[in-house]
Amino acid sequence: MAPAHSRTGKPQKPFRQNNRSLKRKRNEDDLSSLTQRVGELDPKSLAESFSELPLSDATLQGLSASHFKTLTDIQSRAVPHAIKGRDILGAAKTGSGKTLAFLVPVLENLYRKQWTEYDGLGALILSPTRELAIQIFEVLRKIGRYHTFSAGLVIGGKSLQEEQERLGRMNILVCTPGRMLQHMDQTAAFDTAHIQMLVLDEADRIMDMGFQSTVDAIVEHLPKERQTMLFSATQTKKVSDLARLSLRDPEYISVHEAASSATPASLQQHYVVTPLPEKLDTLWSFIRNTLKSKILVFFSSSKQVRFVYEAFRHMQPGIPLLHLHGRQKQSARIDITSKFSRAKYSCLFSTDVAARGLDFPAVDWVIQLDCPEDADTYIHRVGRTARYERDGRAVLFLDPSEEEGMLKRLEQKKIPIERINIKAKKQQSIMNQLQNMCFKDPALKYLGQKAFTSYVKSVHIQKDKDVFNVKSLPLEEFASSLGLPGAPRIKFIKGEDTKSRKNAPRHLAVVPSSDEDSDEEGLTKKKKENEVRTKYDRMFERRNQDVLTEHYTKLIRDEDEIDPDEKDNPAADADEDDGFLSVKRRFDAGDENLGEGLGSEAEIDGIKKGKAVQIDGKEPLIIDSKRREKLLKSKKKLLKYKGKGTKLVYDDEGNAHEIYEMEDEQQFKAQGDADAQRAKYLELEAERTRLADIRDKEIAKQKKREKKEKRRARARAEREAEDGPVAVLAPYEEDEGLREDDFSAEDRGSEDGRAPPSKKQKKWFQSDSDVDGEDGGKKRKRPRAQSPAQVETLEDLEALAAELLE
């Protein structure tokens, strides 16, 4: 029993320690025991669940709440090495759980070091794409919800100023390389001197030529004493790449290195050999036959994605369509990825933006309409399906020229793929529908031109020429399959043969064709003139009026616009490829008939340019269109075609001279020496200035004198107006008669013939209307009060008093 209190007599309560101190002590004990368990951990031992690993309670609670319990192969082998602080090179198949393999060690290592917001940035996670960075950040939020770390997402497309305000308080950052480097260079409060961990997801993509300079600049800002982890489905082993990141004895963990296939076993892989002009027909037929599926289609360029999306959207295949590419705004990209993730049945057209790392749930089909650049890109593309041991199917479309080379590349990477054929009965052609849509929508027609150009360019820039050969592709037929009348001009293809054309003998380029060839060309011309022109031919010869007209005209070049000589002349092609200087005509050296048969210049202009109208100008106005004909009705627009007018002055004798006449050298010398003329000129100008000064002074004196006279006259008029007689009103009496005393002496003086002025005289600055208006508008003045000398009766006194009171 507790002893009683000495003063109150009540039993004393037992002494309780502060709850905070107890909690702090308990946390310290847990941390020390966790550190001891990590030190005793054998990295080679393979655990099956997260609870078997030495992890903190906060991490275990976050994993359990996110329904992560069992470990995958890459997680069971990489996490023990990572939480012990070793550098890691991790490689595993797509969909094997690589994200948790580096997020769990990041949380654990910072937790054991008791990292707080006052310690600054502790871990940096780099991702090649924005969508993958968002996905990593969402997983980090789920499993780290019970930790006290502050985590941030830094990607392009968001407000830089808002990120700068919060960046200094972050402990973990998930970012893309470009935006991260921008903050390192521009954000003053951002400090990376204490970073403990650097993680590169999809490391082979980040370390390639596209991000090489950016990653090198980021690594220069980081301390060398740090832990570095690289994860990817196709890992790099280049010594140069590892040296750039300063890795120290990294642990290379490849889970499926000894596997028979580099792709998941549950993935069914097929390829279809289809000619390039039939690819869109095959894709349309495939979508129409698999409406109850979730499909992801990969293209090589964003222009192709936009064109196919707009075209198929108008034709309504019966399944929701989405499109994703790198030129969209970030908000639209996030919205599209979330829509496709939630959808049960949908078709997404995408570039390689969605090829790496993104986890779209339950994707049934991955279609690669364009051949991937290498086997690694193929692995990442097909990795969007068959994730986490689920079933999936992938189809690769190959042109006959790409089949042999691509199959060899896939075989080297241990990728099993089988060929399938398409049933001709189920294939449907959409070329006529595309032509009809291009006829109705000029914007879609222009987009088709850009899609064609971007595809050919993507094939042209590939390094593997055994697979990608532009010259072996049927470009004319491919353009027709897009609904276009012909293949647009591809300048970089013509430039390939510039060197061979330059080295060719000169006479081969300038010698005209034989008589037989010219006869054949003449027959071809006649056939084209007599050819029936359809509505579609006229439509495609039309010029756009609303969609980038000049740029579109450069892309398109019809056969009728090309000179026949230019077709057979390779030198002309080379000159046109230069685009700066173009050869108008070519002649053989020493041609005697060089100037014959040309006729006069006016004659040529009449043949080529049409009707000429002579206006006041030197050159005639050529009327070669209705717009020029309408221009004749506007005087304002015709001014620029008229000559400039000249102004003439006439002397006393009536001879015309121009305003400015220049003397020639002889006339100037006839007047004397230059110094003498200059002295004479100065003397004349000085005399002229003196006379002008005297004249100006006289004018100033005259104005001053007139002003003084006006002021005196005004003062005189005011004084006369004030000295005039004043009328005095007589008091009211009962009798109506008037007495003689009622008139003042001044009034009686009017009998002498002088009448007082009836109204106030106007001033010098007033007009008659001003005086009348003033008299009518103002209140009439009261009569002047009577003087005491004029008060004679009691009534006069009362009237005077009343006036004074008022």
Swiss-Prot record:
GO terms for molecular function: ATP binding; ATP hydrolysis activity; RNA binding; RNA helicase activity. A motif (DEAD box) lies at residues 201-204. The keyword Signal does not apply. It catalyses: ATP + H2O = ADP + phosphate + H(+). Residues 692-701, 740-754 have a biased composition (Basic and acidic residues). CDD domains: DEADc_DDX10 (cd17941), SF2_C_DEAD (cd18787). GO terms for cellular component: nucleolus. SMART domains: DEXDc (SM00487), DUF4217 (SM01178), HELICc (SM00490). Residues 279-438 form the Helicase C-terminal domain. The keyword Protein transport does not apply. Residues 702-714 have a biased composition (Basic residues). It is found in: Nucleus, Nucleolus. Keywords: ATP-binding, Helicase, Hydrolase, Nucleotide-binding, Nucleus, Ribosome biogenesis, RNA-binding, rRNA processing. Gene3D superfamilies: P-loop containing nucleotide triphosphate hydrolases (3.40.50.300). InterPro entries: DEAD/DEAH_box_helicase_dom, Helicase_ATP-bd, Helicase_C-like, P-loop_NTPase, RNA-helicase_DEAD-box_CS, RNA_helicase_DEAD_Q_motif, SPB4-like_CTE. Residues 79-253 form the Helicase ATP-binding domain. Residues 1-37, 495-530, 555-584, 692-795 are annotated as: Disordered. The Q motif is unique to and characteristic of the DEAD box family of RNA helicases and controls ATP binding and hydrolysis. Belongs to the DEAD box helicase family. DDX10/DBP4 subfamily. ATP-dependent RNA helicase required for ribosome biogenesis. Involved in the release of U14 snoRNA in pre-ribosomal complexes. Required for pre-rRNA cleavage at site A2. This is ATP-dependent RNA helicase DBP4. It comes from Coccidioides immitis (strain RS) (Valley fever fungus).
